[in-house]
């Protein structure tokens, strides 16, 4: 019994270490780092494109996500961040050259350019003035 308990505890500890050591997928956007997870939010609202959630950002702050668009807190490293979703294809037509009348606009009242640079432009506008 003691041996089984010891092996069980050892296995749980090893599983915990592996889980914590798992690297988050990071990508650069302008001057900021992000972690991404695939997330399909309201799939049929605009198109069947892949929606993305930014849940880890160095400069993250609550004003970037409206109250009703916050889904949950997600852990990234030792900190927790809001998860918010958007799509690269910012008008839902599948070509990534949208005019911004999309989920980005509904979230932030702004205009995206279809290739993800919306984030950099929006952040630059907030932080560089």
UniProtKB/Swiss-Prot annotation:
The keyword Metal-binding does not apply. It is found in: Secreted, Extracellular space, Extracellular matrix. It comes from the Eukaryota. Keywords: Disulfide bond, Extracellular matrix, Repeat, Secreted, Signal. GO terms for cellular component: extracellular region. Its main location: secreted. Residues 91-100 are annotated as: 5 X 2 AA tandem repeats of N-G. Sequence repeats lie at residues 91-92, 93-94, 95-96, 97-98, 99-100. Transmembrane segments: none annotated. Component of conchiolin, the organic matrix of nacre. Specifically expressed in mantle epithelium. The keyword Cell cycle does not apply. Residues 1-23 form the signal peptide. May be specifically involved in the formation of the nacreous layer. Belongs to the N16 matrix protein family. Heterooligomer; disulfide-linked. Pif97, Pif80, N16 and other proteins form a complex. This is N16.5 matrix protein. It comes from Pinctada fucata (Akoya pearl oyster).
């Amino acid at each position: 019994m003691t041996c089984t308990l010891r092996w069980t505890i050892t296995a749980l500890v090893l599983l915990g270490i592996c889980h914590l050591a798992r690297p988050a997928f990071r990508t650069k956007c302008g001057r900021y780092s992000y972690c991404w997870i695939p997330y399909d939010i309201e799939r049929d609202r605009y198109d069947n494109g892949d929606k993305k959630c930014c849940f880890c950002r160095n400069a993250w702050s609550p004003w970037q996500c409206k109250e009703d668009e916050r889904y949950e807190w997600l852990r990234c490293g030792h900190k927790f961040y809001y998860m918010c979703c958007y799509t690269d294809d910012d008008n839902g037509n599948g070509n990534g050259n949208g005019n911004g009348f999309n989920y980005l606009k509904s979230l932030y009242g702004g205009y995206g350019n279809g290739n993800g640079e919306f984030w950099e432009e929006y952040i630059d506008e907030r932080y560089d003035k």
